[in-house]
Structure formats: C-alpha cells, structure tokens
Amino acid sequence: MEISRDFYLDKLIKRKHNGLIKVITGIRRCGKSYLLNNLFYHHLLNNGVNADHIIRFAFDSADDLYLIGESLIQIQKEKRGIDPEKFMAYIRSKVADDGMYYLLLDEIQMLDCFEAVLNGYLRKDNMDVFVTGSNARLLSKDIATEFAGRGDEVHMYPLSFAEFMNVYNGDKYMGLSEYMLYGGIPLVVLREGANDKAAALQNLFNEIYIRDITRRNRVKNIGELEDLLNILSSAIGSLTNPEKLKNTFKTVKKSRITSATIKKYLDYFEDSFLIESAQRYDIKGKAYIETPKKYYFSDLGLRNARINFRQFEQTHSMENVIYNELRMRGYSVDVGVIPIAEKDKDGKVTRKQLEVDFVCNMGSVRYYIQSAYSLPDETKRIQEIRPFRRIDDSFKKIVITKDVVQPYYDEYGILTINIYDFLLDPHCIEK
C-alpha cells in the first residue's frame, strides 16, 4: 500500500534546481528513503526525466556498496565511514553527457567527508543533489556552516494523524486512539494486529535506535543510557534537567551517574531525532529560561514501546501529539511561563508561575495553545484559560480539547477547538 506524503513531496518539488543541496533529515524509518527513492523518483520520471539521469545510491545498502567495492559488514566491523574516492568514481562513471542529473543519496552521513563531496557536486551546473540523513549532529546543526549557506533542509516526521487517516480503515475517533498508542512509523502503521505492531516497535527501538546511538557515540554503559530513556518515556511533557535526572538515578537506581553524562545522553537522543526538547519562555519578560526543559518523543508508538505499553496517560500523550503536529507544520515551539504575584487569604503576597503549554512561532505569527484533555465543566475551563488572561498581547489564544465540540470563541476572544479538527485541518487555528 502506498502512503501519500504530499506535504514533503511538494517541498522537494519546489526546491528543484535551486542551486542548493536538499537535505532530508528525520528519525530513522520515518519514510525519508521512501519519499526520495519512490515518491520523488517517480515524480521525476513522470515529468520527463530519463531514468539514466537519476542516480540513486543508498549508503546503508549492501548491494549499493558492492557497486563501489565496499562491504557494509566490513565498514561496521571497522567502525569507519565509506571511502569518498570510490563513491565519486562511481558517480563519474554514471554521468555520460551534459544533461541534468539528479543525485538521490540515502543516509549520506555514512560517507566520509560527505560535506566536501556534496559541495563539489554543487559546482557542477548539471547536477541537482538530494540527500537524506538520520543524524542531527552531522546534518541539521551543521548545514549552514558545512555547506556555506548552500544547504536546504527538509525535516521529516513520522506520519501525521492526517496522513495516518489516509490509510486507516476506521473513523477518526478510533483512529486517534490507535495513533496515540502505536504512533506513525510507516512500517508499523501498515502492520496488521496489535501484537505485530507492538513487536515491530520494540524491535525498532532495540535493533535500530539503541544500536545506532550506542555505536555512533561509542557508549560504554548502555544500561545507563537505556535507564534514562525509560525515565524520559515515563515522564513525557514533564519539566526536567540533567541535575533532576541525576537525583532520580541516585534515588531509584542507586547510580552515581553525573549530570554531565546525562546531558551527553540527552544530546545523543536529540541528535538521532528520537526526542525533541522545548525550552521555557518568559512571556512577560520576553526571555528564554535555560532550564528545566520538557522532552517529547518524535513518535508516541516508540515511547509506548519503550515502557512496554504499560503506562498510557491520555493527557500527556495528547500533549505530545499536539507538539509533534505543530513542529511538523513548521512552528518553533516553547513552553510559556508567566510570573505572577497574588495575595493569599491572609493578605500575604506569594509569587508563582502560570504555564502555557505551547508558545508557537513562525515568522511574525504567534499562537498560545493549551492542551486540555477534557473540559467537563466551567471550573476546568476557567482553570485552563487563566494563564491566557495574564498575557497582555493580542496574539491568538487557543484551547485544544479531546471533547467533541464545535469551534467557538468565548467572551475573552479565546478559541476552543477539538483535537480532531486541529489535527485534520491545518488551517483551523487560522480561522
């Protein structure tokens, strides 16, 4: 079954012939290779490009590596990258004329000196270069510097709920329940049956993500790293930092792990796109607060598999889904903080902080969003909108609930919508 990824395909099509290296990043198995080597490849063919002018090469494919005299097993044994000279010789053998050639290169981070190789291809007028990569440290964080302003990133996520519903055989209510449980990794979505989906997710975690992270970063104490993943999985959407996590290890695991080691492991997880962090932002002071942060999983199915599907908290899971959707749509997402001073019943002034779940920015557009699993009564609604009423600016304020409600604005101009409309209609918060 073909899964439509039009949102990302359109991004690639618009970037053709722009003189930049198109870099598709994202967690492994989110669909980058399928997007590049199937959907985009067939777009090129359907638009008159000859197959011999499309050069596809996957650096994690034993068959492709054989073509250039390399061995995947040997590379992994020796813990080294792929010889760039052998690869460039292969490309030269494929370029037979001055016509436009499209290079579709998969898992580019496995190639030694890939930055220099790609920059070299950019100097050729007849090459349009598209690559994928699964390591943020090698790609996302360095695109601007390594490619001297000539890198153009398209970050890809697992299936959004809207993409998921295109292949799900059921209504949106049951669909969201399954999506929040098993996530949107394409190969998992296409599996039949709960047991198969769960097994696939657990296998992905152990055989792909953990293995990649430990090998790439040469982690010696794999047990500590996995324990940290378990702690993060049990506390999605909770404020934390390396020092707090160190204390958790000390109390629960009787471990002497340092906060510096925990910080390093958190970086590894973010670099592999397994998790993302949201910083706190002082809305009144207009300044970022360095720590603590909130961490969200790029795929809820992976998070649930990590804790063996034992701890399914609808409130935090819904918050994670909303966060991922906002990031997929291109917003930067922070956690809003509003310092306030209030008098208690004895007249004593106390200082506290109100929280806005998400402060979303894209260019000059900003939204303040609260995730409220349910709004059973007016008391709960007032509680959810309380932080909004302390914000002095005119940016739109939105409450997203799982309750099936029609969109409405209250007397304060605050929009309430249901999560189904939010996830299935990308323009609903603009209306």
Question: Which residues does each PLM region occupy?
Answer:
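Pre-Walker A adenine-sensing motif
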Residues: M1-G19
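A cross-kingdom feature that marks ATP-driven nucleic-acid transaction machinery
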Residues: E2, T25, R29, S33-Y34, ...
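Interdomain hinge/linker elements that couple catalytic modules in large macromolecular machines
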Residues: E2, Y157, A162-P339, R351
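Hydrophobic positions on the alpha1 helix immediately C-terminal to the Walker A/P-loop
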Residues: L35, L39
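Conserved catalytic segments around the Walker B and adjacent sensor/switch elements
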Residues: L45-S61
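Short glycine-rich substrate-engagement loop in P-loop NTPases that contacts/grips substrate
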Residues: F57-G99
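Structural recognition of the conserved hydrophobic beta-strand(s) that form the central parallel beta-sheet
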Residues: L104, D128-S134, H155
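Short regulatory helix/loop adjacent to the ATP-binding pocket of P-loop NTPases
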Residues: G120, R137-E153, V167-N169
